[in-house]
Design a protein with these regions (language model features):
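Residue-level marker for buried hydrophobic side chains located in beta-strands
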Residues: 12-14, 42-44, 121, 205
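Short, basic, glycine/proline-bearing loop/turn elements
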Residues: 11-19, 54-58, 173-180
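Short glycine-/acidic-enriched loop or helix-start segments at secondary-structure transitions
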Residues: 53-55, 93-96, 132-133, 214-216, ...
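Conserved beta-sheet core of the metallophosphoesterase superfamily
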Residues: 105-109, 126, 130-137, 182, ...
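Core catalytic region of metal-dependent phosphoesterases/phosphodiesterases
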Residues: 2-11, 22-115
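Active-site-proximal loop/helix segment associated with metal-binding centers of metalloenzymes
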Residues: 123-188
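Active-site glycine-centered loops adjacent to acidic/histidine catalytic or metal-binding residues
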Residues: 17, 47, 87, 124, ...
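Binuclear metal-dependent phosphoesterase catalytic core
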Residues: 113-116, 216-286
Length: 286
């Protein structure tokens, strides 16, 4: 039996918006997902790290985050072409465009040919966000509201775990009821599709807005991989070039035991805030 026996096989996998470094990153689900797949291409489409949060005293780095990055390196070592397109929360890595770090290529955007011949443009998506590009005040207000939503989401997640229930995003359910949020998403998608037409590509793949979607608009397919904070979603390319949206929180609901996964790690260490000691090798952080 080969080491890849029993794994889900895809041609390409697109993930974005993991926000490692924050307490809301669902690293356990992404680690589980990457542990169950093999692929020719893995696209890390921005905001994999949250450098904004890591510059404050409120960042967190559980050992599971390190194991997750090791899994990415394992895939690269096994022959997967890993491409990292930094976003606005990890724009630090935009200083290294054209470089290769640990087998991971770093690009501002990337053009990928699907197996069926379609041309895909991969970019994070903050290029289309008027809030990020034009208004610091609106961005601050939005971030404050988002912090509140994610706080409620953490409480909901803890309660559901105590009740033995699977992951469900309270914050997402609330956002779906806000008309302005839906309008913003529609405008973002329209801007991305327009950009794809201007660039003469068949598919635009982005992230950024934490709203997974896959839809055809005339000659252009819009693909948003969502996030691993609220959705736990990815876009996958099958061997024939077909694109699909995967919700791993639902896919793994009957199987994934988060507590068992975390406890299986050799050290249950967590680095927080101003604690700069190295994580791992025996020292637990509180």
């Amino acid at each position: 039996m080969s080491q890849n026996a029993g794994l889900l096989s895809y041609r390409s996998v697109f993930i974005s918006d993991v926000h490692l470094g924050t307490k809301d990153a669902r690293a356990e689900y992404l680690f589980d997902f990457l542990s169950h797949i093999r692929c020719e291409y893995l696209f890390l489409n921005g905001d994999i790290f949250d450098i904004w949060k890591m510059k404050t005293s409120r960042w967190q780095w559980p050992l599971l985050n390190t194991r997750l990055l090791q899994r990415v390196m394992e895939l690269a070592a096994q022959g997967t072409q890993v491409v990292y397109v930094p976003g606005n929360h990890d724009e630090f890595f935009r200083d290294y465009l054209g470089s290769e770090l640990g087998g991971v290529q770093i690009h501002r955007e990337y053009r990928h040919t699907l197996a069926d011949g379609r041309k895909a443009l991969i970019l994070h998506g903050d290029e289309f966000d008027g809030v990020v590009r034009h208004s610091r005040v609106l961005k601050w207000i939005g971030n404050a509201g988002y912090e509140l939503l994610m706080g409620l989401n953490r409480i909901s997640t803890r309660i559901r775990r105590l009740l033995g229930k699977g992951y469900w995003s309270l914050s997402l359910a609330i956002k779906n009821q806000v008309p302005n949020a839906r309008t913003y998403i529609e405008k973002f998608e329209t801007a991305a599709i327009r950009h794809a037409r201007e660039q003469d590509v068949d598919v635009v793949v982005c992230g950024h807005i934490h709203h997974a979607n896959l839809r055809q608009d005339g000659s252009v397919m819009y693909a948003n991989s969502g996030d691993w904070v609220e959705h736990c979603t990815a876009i996958i390319e099958q061997e024939n070039g077909a694109l699909e949206l995967v919700n791993w929180a639902k896919e793994s609901a009957d199987r994934l035991d988060v507590r068992a996964l975390i406890q299986s790690l050799p050290v249950s260490a967590v680095a927080r805030g101003k604690d700069r000691r190295p994580v791992g090798s025996g020292a637990a952080h509180s």
